[in-house]
Structure formats: C-alpha cells, structure tokens
Amino acid sequence: MTDGNLSTSTNGVALMGILDSRPGNHIQNLQHLTLKAPRSLSLPEYGPKLKLSALEDRHSLQSVDSGIPTLEIGNPEPVPCSVVHVRRKPSESEIVPERACQSACLLPSYAPPAPAGAEREQSVRKSSTFPRTGYDSVKLYSPASQTLQRSDNVSVCSVSSLSTELSTTLSVSNEDILDLVVTSSSSAIVTLENDDDPQFTDVTLSSTRETRDLQRDCAGETEEGRKLRLLGPFSHFFTRNSLARKQNARLDKQSDLGWKLFGKVPLGENAQKDAKKLQKEYEDKAGRPSKPPSPKQNVRKNLDFEPLSTTALILEDRPANLPAKPAEEAQKHRQQYEEMVVQAKKRELKEAQRRKKQLEERCRLEESIGNAVLTWNNEILPNWETMWCSRKVRDLWWQGIPPSVRGKVWSLAIGNELNITHELFDICLARAKERWRSFSTGGSEAETEDAGFSAADREASLELIKLDISRTFPSLCIFQQGGPYHDMLHSVLGAYTCYRPDVGYVQGMSFIAAVLILNLDTADAFIAFSNLLNKPCQMAFFRVDHGLMLTYFAAFEVFFEENLPKLFAHFKKNNLTPDIYLIDWIFTLYSKSLPLDLACRVWDVFCRDGEEFLFRTALGLLRLFQDVLTRMDFIHVAQFLTRLPEDLPAEEFFASIASIQMQSRNKKWAQVLTALQKDSREMEKGSPSLRH
C-alpha cells in the first residue's frame, strides 16, 4: 500500500488520502485520543470544548478546514455495535485498543473531560494529532478490524461508504499520513477530533459472527503484511495482483449479503439465502412481476383515437377552495367536453386517413419505380436502338425515369453529335485551370488572348461563373463554396468556356450543368452539357439570337391561342408578351422555376420529345393556373409566373401538360416553326408578338 492512498474492501467503501508534504510537521505529544459512541446513531454528539496550546497548534494543519464528517444512517432499528476506546499506556509509546462495548442496544453518549492545564486564552480551534514517535499502529477492533499504519505526509483522510444502507465516514486530522484499510459490512464513523468542533464517535455496526470472520481475514492479511515488510521495497512487485484478487474476493463475498441498489432486495434475517431467492421473495411480497413487461404490450394494436390531451384539459370538479359547480353548469361542461372529444376524434380520423393514403401512394410509387428499374436495365437499355421509340418505352418515359438509370438514359437520348471524349474534357479543363491561375497572378493580356477574344471578356466570364455558382440551388447548399459539388460544377462550366469561347458563359448555364452533375459523372456531364447547348433552341437563346428568339415566341403564341384562347386574350389585353416569362423557363430548362424532382421529370420527356416539350410545358403551366391568372393584372401575372408556387402537384401538372394539343390547323410544332422562320425573312411583322 502506497503513501497517501487508502483502500477498502467492503461494499464499495472508498478511501482517499490528501498528501501534506510540508516540512517540520512534528507533534511531540498526543494530548488525548478517545473513540466515542453517540447516544443516537442518527445525530452527532457534541462534547466539551478542548483547547490546545499555541505551541502545539503551531505544528497542526492550517491549510485545510476542520473537516466536517457526515453521518447518514438509514436503518432506524438498533444494530449490534462495537465501540473502540483507544488509550495510550503511560509506560509504552503504543496505543492499545480496548473493547468498550458490544451490545445490540443503543450506546450512551460519552465525552471526555477537558485536559488539565490548557491555556484557554491563547488556544485556537484545532484538531489533536498523533505524534510521530507515539505509536506504530492503531488497531480498530470493529467487525472490520484493520490497522491504522503510520506513513508520511497526510493531513486529512476521509472514508465514505457507498453502501445504500448506511454511510461511513472517517475523518482524521493528523500531520502524518495514515494508510487505512477499512472492512465493514455496515457503516461507521471514526473521528479523531479534540477541539471545539462537534465531537463525533467511532461506531461500527455488524453482527458478532461477521466480526469474528472479518477478524480472521484481517489477521491473515496482517501476517501477509509482516512478510511483505521483510521483502522491503520490492514487495509491491510480488503482491500487486494477489492482494487485488483477495480484496475482490472479499468484496464479492460480502456484497451478496448486503442490500441491492435502489432497495430491490433488503437484508433479510437469514443472510445465507441466495440473492436470487431474496429477490424473488421480495418481488412476490411487493406484488411486482419478476420479469419486465414485454415491449409489445405497450404497442397499440389499433389506431383508434384516444383523446388523452382533451381529457387532461377538462376538469371534472372545481378545486376544494371554490364553490361546487351547479348541476346545470356541470351538465353543460360535460356536453361541451363530449363535443370536443367527438371533434378531436374526427380530426384524428381524417388525419389518419390522409396519412394512410400518402403511405399507400408512396408504397405504390416505390413498387412502380422498382419494376421500372428492372424493365429499363433488362429490356430497354440493352436494346436501346430498337426500343427507345416504341410505345411501351414512351409510356414509361412519360411516367418518369427512375433516378438510378436517369443519367444513362439522358446521355443516350441527348447523344454525342459533337464527338466529345473524356480526353477532350481533360484538355479543356487543364486550359481553364491555367487561365484561372494566370488571371489570379496577373498574367499578361497577350497570353490570354485567343481567337479574337480579349482577356477582359474571358475574365468577365470567369467572374460571372463564380457569381452564378453561388446562386445555383442555394437551398441544397451543395454547389456553393465548400460544398461537395462546387468544384465539379466549376470544372464543367470552365471547360465549356474554353471549348466554346464564341458562346462563353451565359447566366443560367449553371442550373443546367448542376442538374446534369447530379445524375452523371463530371466528364459525362460535360459531354451531355455541350451537346445539349448545341441544340437549335438552346443555341438561339444562349447566343442571344434575337430574331430566332422572336420566332420561337411567335410559334409559342400560335399554340397558346389554339389551346387557351380566353387566357391568351387576357394576356393580349394586358400586353403580356411571352418573353416576360419564357426566357427564364427556357434558359434554365425549368430547373430554377420548378421543384427539382418535378424539373427532372420535365427533363425526362424533354430528352424524348426535344424543344417542343419545353413550350408544351409552358402551356401546361398556364392551363394549370388559368383561373388564377385571368383575375390578375399585368404586375401580378408577371410576378406569379416568374415565381411559381413550390407545392405544385406533379400528377395534376403532367395531366395539364398532356391536355395540350401541339397541333394548329393540322400543323405540328416543327412545321409551324419552319413556316415562321421563312416568313420572318420576308415579313418582319408576321405575328403579333413580332410587332415592335
């Protein structure tokens, strides 16, 4: 056992020592040392005031408080006790313990007389201490008879029993260290105090049989201690594990007889019973089941509404300090309460039906998506060239492509007419990174000029890319600086500006590239992005071909008037031209205006039908909200169409698109657009939308 450490071996008793390494802590005499018993085991006993001389007090502990030990006794019945009086023989420098009392009754209080010759004027409050030469050991003959062995440099040590029945506290005010080993099946208080502070007593509680057993264990341990002292400083190498095993064995042996935590098993009269039997007997007596209830017992087997919150809000009776309710008022309140419960049940039933319907729709959608994935992977994609235009594939396409195969289908549908390879993407990306570095380091303008495009134009494109990326799907927070897709989006847009310097970067491209990146790898997204922007409609808008853009607007108005004549007239009356709302929709392919999942479904059919579906989708939106739009003026219509509602119903939206007929006087979209392109060269005002 090392200095400053105190160990215990019963019921989780823990001892802690506090080292005091100040030099010169020597006490010459032991004034008085008595271990006392209180009159009651629940309260401390106060003794007469004792004063020590200033010389003796000068060697006492001054850096810590006087130490207030605590006594917590939960057992109100008398317990067999044994009290120890420790006295010093006048002829020997040894402290000999004396058995003072052992009975099953409560002990009388005892307080020693004040020492003679004490100077009360110069005395201060301080604890009595053991002299270094006054003793070798102090043995407490309690049921946990152990040894107080002298060591060095301790000022205060306290013992607190972790037993749930009683509490044990040992407080020793001494200039020397005390290594204590306390073994107790009950609890006790040991206080070596001789001052003005409250006088606490040394009490150990146990039975006689347990006392003898513990004394035998202590005697064996004392014999081992003498052997270990012969080994000198190497003793701890041989006993480090053996002592721990013995202490653990005693702990296991005695913990079986004690109380379980939280009072599950009280200490019975027959301590030899098995702990499981005691547990069962106590549970039977208390009427509690031996096994915890199954979690399934708490699960509601039906979904019937139980208005628990409503019943908690309604009080049946008034408080006792108020007059009782009249019979009429009580009946009225009871009826109101029943009506509230009925309404609550109706609301809960309606909500449950709504949730059940949503769950059924979700399950049906997941099942249809799973079946569609199998169909696309096993039947359509292996035979793409022969099946992509079949009626079955078109029907599946309209219902929406499963996300797991969407990127592959988009790549096949868009095609690669430009024959862009992954190596070309790497070259364009490397050139873009080189230009970014040159701009950041202030490179010369001559190094960055290429194909007639000045460095200022390229720098403007790079700044616009940086600004536009930060505004791309801001709610997702994945394309902004530090997001997982920021670098990928920056690479695709930068590589495209190097691939098509004549087009450069136009605001709105970031949304198209972002949707492709969410479904394809970076290189494949770049290939699809380049081929998609090479389509006639996208090239007209991104190159800002004003004449061709007006032709597309004129073709749109032809089918607008054919399908929605009433709304078309309302727009004409308020001078609402298509460019107010179509430019944003076409530039971003609805990825900015519609929710992302709905925009992806629009992209699915757009990859199948081409640019015609973009204008058909616009007519479907106008048809879906035509009742609202006809009651709005110019400003409100423009605001509504540029900021569509976020909770668009997908099925109603696509049903509205399906109702749009893309035929006008037996002419389809392509035929009408071609005719308008021819007429635009001859007649600049061939359509109302072309009038300036």
From Swiss-Prot:
- Give the residue ranges for region: Disordered: 270-303, 315-335
Tell me which residues bear Phosphoserine. Answer: S91, S294
Where does it localize?
Golgi apparatus, cis-Golgi network; Golgi apparatus, trans-Golgi network
- UniProt-listed InterPro entries: Rab-GAP-TBC_dom, Rab-GAP_TBC_sf, Rab_GAP_TBC_domain
Bilayer-crossing residues are none
User: Its GO CC terms?
Assistant: autophagosome; Golgi apparatus; recycling endosome
Query: Source organism's superkingdom?
Result: Eukaryota
Example of a GO MF term: GTPase activator activity
Q: Where are the compositionally biased (Basic and acidic residues) regions?
A: 271-287, 326-335
**Residue limits of the Rab-GAP TBC domain?**
400-610
Where mainly located? Golgi
Q: Which UniProt keywords apply?
A: Golgi apparatus, GTPase activation, Phosphoprotein
List GO BP terms, alphabetically. Answer: regulation of autophagosome assembly
What is this protein's function per UniProt?
Answer: Plays a role in the regulation of starvation-induced autophagosome formation. Together with the TRAPPIII complex, regulates a constitutive trafficking step from peripheral recycling endosomes to the early Golgi, maintaining the cycling pool of ATG9 required for initiation of autophagy.
Q: How is the quaternary structure described?
A: Interacts with ULK1. May interact with RAB11A and RAB11B, but does not exhibit any GTPase-activating activity toward these proteins. Interacts with TRAPPC8.
Q: What PANTHER family does the record tag this protein with?
A: RAB GTPASE-ACTIVATING PROTEIN 1-LIKE (PTHR47219), TBC1 DOMAIN FAMILY MEMBER 14 (PTHR47219:SF21)
Please identify the protein, giving its name as recorded.
TBC1 domain family member 14
